[in-house]
Amino acid sequence: MLAITRDELAGRLPIVNGVYAEGSLEAQRLARMAHEGGASALLVFPPAIYTMGQRPEMAIEHVRRIAEVTDLPLIIFQYNPAGGQGYPLSTLLRMVDEVPTIAAIKDWCGNAQLADRQIRALNGRSRPVHVLSTHSAWLFSSLVLGCKGLLSGSGSVIADLQAQLFEAVQNKDLALAQKIHDRVYHTAEVFYADPFVDMHNRMKEALVLLGKLPRAVVRPPLVKIPAAEIERIRQALIAAGLLAA
């Protein structure tokens, strides 16, 4: 996948490659592979084992080991701490101190108050670490807190709208930002409906409707979403001004 992406982009855009593994040694292998394959940065996912609890030293060691094998910038994926995989702010700050190649976090903490606290803590450091929002279900609200960008799965469908929204917020053009948000809202409502696990399946169906994918394929145990839901996605794309009625 990385090789295909690299060949298609031909250096026009940076490539962020995800690193997800339950063990740090496997994470190191993936990081090396991504580095050698031409990635520009690495997005480090938290292991699922953290749902059973984590020590700060465990979380930091996992990231430190990845940084041992590559000098690529690291983006730490911050999950919701309530689920166990997210890092307490104190752990996150220690991690940033001890791993100097951390350049940003992808913030999915799921809490506006915590998101605000993280932005202030990370932006205010002598070596600022950027906060990239992935609160795609409430993107407008998250960006106005002071995020330095966004890293969102729904960018596969609405990257242009997301970029316009970010620029409007950066320019403090509230009226324009609200206007763009009104379009983004329709897609967020269908992409991030229950069950949440189907969000990427829905985005694939949207890309088919937009003529950007020939078909939407899912891997078991995921299943194709029903026709009625695909129709709701079609109506949302129309409401967002992305598809003709």
Predicted regions and their residues:
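Active-site beta->alpha loop and helix N-cap motifs at the rims of alpha/beta catalytic domains
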Residues: 1-86, 223
